[in-house]
Amino acid sequence: WESGDLELFDLVEEVXLNFY
């Protein structure tokens, strides 16, 4: 993945963990 995608993935993963 590109750097931007990795940053977005990290953000989504963090939000998902907080969501669950």
Swiss-Prot record:
<keyword id="KW-0238">DNA-binding</keyword>
<keyword id="KW-0492">Microsome</keyword>
<keyword id="KW-0472">Membrane</keyword>
<dbReference type="GO" id="GO:0031965">
    <property type="term" value="C:nuclear membrane"/>
</dbReference>
<keyword id="KW-0539">Nucleus</keyword>
<feature type="topological domain" description="Lumenal">
    <location>
        <begin position="1"/>
        <end position="20"/>
    </location>
</feature>
<feature type="domain" description="J">
    <location>
        <begin position="18"/>
        <end position="20"/>
    </location>
</feature>
<dbReference type="GO" id="GO:0003677">
    <property type="term" value="F:DNA binding"/>
</dbReference>
<protein>
    <recommendedName>
        <fullName>DnaJ homolog subfamily C member 1</fullName>
    </recommendedName>
</protein>
<keyword id="KW-0256">Endoplasmic reticulum</keyword>
<dbReference type="GO" id="GO:0005789">
    <property type="term" value="C:endoplasmic reticulum membrane"/>
</dbReference>
<keyword id="KW-0812">Transmembrane</keyword>
<keyword id="KW-0143">Chaperone</keyword>
<comment type="subunit">
    <text>Interacts (via SANT 2 domain) with SERPINA3; the interaction delays the formation of the covalent inhibitory complex SERPINA3-chymotrypsin, but does not alter the catalytic activity of SERPINA3. Interacts (via SANT 2 domain) with ITIH4 (via C-terminus); the interaction protects ITIH4 against in vitro cleavage by kallikrein. Interacts (via J domain) with HSPA5. Interacts (via cytosolic domain) with ribosomes.</text>
</comment>
